[in-house]
């Protein structure tokens, strides 16, 4: 009976150790995927932000050049 208990304990132990190792590797893989997703999302957000800034600067530049042109015409006329 003691032999069966030890054998059962050994089988359970040998089965649980690899299972816990697999679970920790799985969690590490999921964490890496989440980090990659977060980084790609940050890149997309940064790209959208820069695009918006570029559009705004282009609009401001056009308004400034129009106003500057009007001032030059008024000064010459």
UniProtKB/Swiss-Prot annotation:
The record's section on InterPro entries has: Frog_antimicrobial_propeptide, FSAP
Q: Name one Pfam family in it.
A: FSAP_sig_propep
UniProt region (Disordered), positions on chain = 24-45
Q: Where is the composition biased (Acidic residues)?
A: 30-40
Query: What is its subcellular localisation?
Result: Secreted; Target cell membrane
The record's principal subcellular location, in a coarse class, is secreted
Tell me where the signal peptide lies.
Answer: 1-22
Q: Which UniProt keywords apply?
A: Amidation, Amphibian defense peptide, Antibiotic, Antimicrobial, Cleavage on pair of basic residues, Membrane, Secreted, Signal, Target cell membrane, Target membrane
Q: Which GO terms describe its biological process?
A: defense response to bacterium
Q: Which residues carry this modification: Glutamine amide?
A: 76
Q: Which domain of life is it from?
A: Eukaryota
Which residue numbers fall in the propeptide? Answer: 23-42
Query: What cellular-component terms does GO give this entry?
Result: extracellular region; membrane; other organism cell membrane
Report where it is expressed, by tissue. Answer: Highest expression in skin and to a lesser extent in brain and intestine.
Q: Which family does it belong to?
A: Belongs to the frog skin active peptide (FSAP) family. Dermatoxin subfamily.
Which function does this protein serve?
Possesses a potent antimicrobial activity against Gram-positive bacteria B.megaterium, C.glutamicum and S.aureus and mollicutes A.laidlawii and S.melliferum. Less active against Gram-negative bacteria B.cepacia, P.aeruginosa, S.typhimurium and S.meliloti. Probably acts by disturbing membrane functions with its amphipathic structure.
What more does the record tell us? The sequence shown corresponds to the dermatoxin isolated from frog skin. A variant of it is present in frog brain.
**Protein name according to UniProt:** Dermatoxin-B1
Organism field: Phyllomedusa bicolor (Two-colored leaf frog)
């Amino acid at each position: 009976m003691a032999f069966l208990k030890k054998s059962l304990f050994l089988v359970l132990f040998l089965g649980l150790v690899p299972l816990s190792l697999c679970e920790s590797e799985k969690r590490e893989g999921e964490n890496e995927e989440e980090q990659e997703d977060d980084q790609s999302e940050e890149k997309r957000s940064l790209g959208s932000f820069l695009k918006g800034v570029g559009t705004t600067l282009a609009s401001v530049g056009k308004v400034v050049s129009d106003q500057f042109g009007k001032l030059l015409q008024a000064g010459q006329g």
